[in-house]
Amino acid sequence: MVIAGVSPPTPSSENLLQEHEEKHFTATDVVRDVIIGVSDGLTVPFALAAGLSGANVPSSLILTAGIAEVAAGAISMGLGGYLAAKSEEDHYMRELKREQEEIINVPDVEAAEIGEILAQYGLEPHVYNPVVNSLRKNPQAWLDFMMKFELGLEKPEPRRALESAMTIALAYVVGGLVPLSPYFFIPFAKQAMITSIAVTLLALVVFGYIKGRFTGSNPVLSSIQTAIIGALASAAAYAMAKAVQSV
């Protein structure tokens, strides 16, 4: 179908499309899960270990408590990620069923909504009416269009909930082992805590830089921002731990 005012693709334009390589990063859900897992993993076990270090307990006890917290935190965070992704999937399916019923029961209203959506992009009725008619002949394409452009919902991946749970849990474990690593090698808790602070800050800087590279933001700015936010969060958690100990 040729839309008025729009030239059909020519062989040369099709060749250009084939030669052009998009460099957009689209795995935003995975990046979000990794950020959630690693950032929490770097912060919570560090605060626990630092708080126990101030109580003059041996490194072995801190290590045992820290590993137990990492295991429990990974399970909890993973379960939270699973439930969140599952809720999104359930919401999508409910809206999909509702939209299917509306297309069957009130097709003229739904067709008018297509026109309203396309008009928001500056298209005139004589331009978008052929598009509306084409979509009415293809119910599945019509349904997909309404889900995406009317409701703003993307179809979740079938295994998204499980993948989210595994990604967050694994990222939490990786992040949590970083501040605990000095306690494996340094028997004196306060010395291990100083090393843990340095290692955790370095990990936050590296993590922020990598995050910036993947998300397209300034890597240096991202690393500084991540380090500052992580340091403030860790300091707040440490202060709360010390306050509880003093009660």
Swiss-Prot record:
Amino-acid positions noted as binding Fe cation 2 in the UniProt annotation, renumbered to this chain: 99, 110, 113, 146
InterPro entries in alphabetical order: Ccc1_fam (IPR008217)
Segments on the Cytoplasmic side according to the record's topology features: 1-33, 82-167, 213-219
A Pfam family assignment: VIT1
GO MF annotation list: manganese ion transmembrane transporter activity; metal ion binding
Keywords: Ion transport, Iron, Iron transport, Membrane, Metal-binding, Transmembrane, Transmembrane helix, Transport, Vacuole
Tissue: Expressed at high levels in the blue epidermal cells of the inner bottom part of the petal (at protein level). No detectable expression in parenchyma and epidermis of the purple segments of the petal, parenchyma of the blue segments, leaf, stem, bulb and root (at protein level). High levels of mRNA in the blue epidermal cells of the inner bottom part of the petal. Low-levels of mRNA in the purple segments of the petal, stem, leaf, root, bulb and pistil.
Positions bound to Fe cation 1: 99, 102, 110, 113, 150
Localization (cell): Vacuole membrane
UniProt topology in membrane: Multi-pass membrane protein
Catalytic activity: Fe(2+)(in) = Fe(2+)(out)
Keyword Membrane: yes
Residue numbers binding Fe cation 3: 102, 110, 113
Misc. remarks from the entry: Expression of VIT1 with simultaneous RNAi silencing of FER1 results in cells of a darker blue color compared to expression of VIT1 only, indicating that VIT1 expression and FER1 suppression are critical for the development of blue color in the perianth bottom.
Family of the protein in this entry: Belongs to the CCC1 family.
Biological function: Vacuolar iron transporter involved in the transfer of iron ions from the cytosol to the vacuole for intracellular iron storage. Plays an essential role in the development of blue coloration in tulip petals most likely due to the accumulation of ferrous ions that can form complexes with anthocyanins.
Protein known as: Vacuolar iron transporter 1
Organism of this sequence: Tulipa gesneriana (Garden tulip)
Lineage, uppermost ranks: Eukaryota, Viridiplantae, Streptophyta, Embryophyta, Tracheophyta
